[in-house]
Amino acid sequence: MIKSALPILKRILPARLTNLYRQTIAGDNPPLGEFYPIQVGKSKNFSGREFGELLSNHNGRPMVKMAHFIGIYEDLLSPYKEAHSRSSNPLRLLEIGVSKGGSLEIWKKYFGETALIYGIDIDERCREISIPGVEIRIGSQVDQAFLSSVLKELGDPQIIIDDGSHHADHLSLTLEMLWPHLQDGGVYIIEDTHTSYWKEYGGGYLKN
């Protein structure tokens, strides 16, 4: 999927960033803070902060993220980790898009044993993923009945992360359905919004 996206990136990104993207595909490791995908556990340059150190030492399930996400996640999620450590109530996190299960594994390590971590995916193969303390449910992110059943188990989450289909229509529909269930003071994160510019994901430049 990374290689197939390269022609599109060439059209929409400055040459400098495209070169970084190409280098990463070839296996190089450019400086952190640029726009390029990294496989957590193989890139060992996340240092200086707790979340970065956790990623640097991760040797579990595969997880691919854009490098510039790491600092953003640290800034957004560290207050919830701190509040959770002082509360008797469990932190509740819902992630849309399981893939290989790497990010769910990371969230569990980061927030601790008492955190309630749920992941949803349409891929039946995700049923085979087993992560202690993490629940995975199979269904569509735009199926209201399915989402309601997951929320009935999990409760209203403090953190929602949409890393699912990345399709423009799905992003907006999922937001409409889940936003009313986000706890006051919670955070709703949508990853990879650059797909809003890609026609194959229902987007397009200056599309209304």
Which residues make up each language-model segment?
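A short alpha-helical cap/connector motif
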Residues: M1-I161, S165-I190, H194-N208
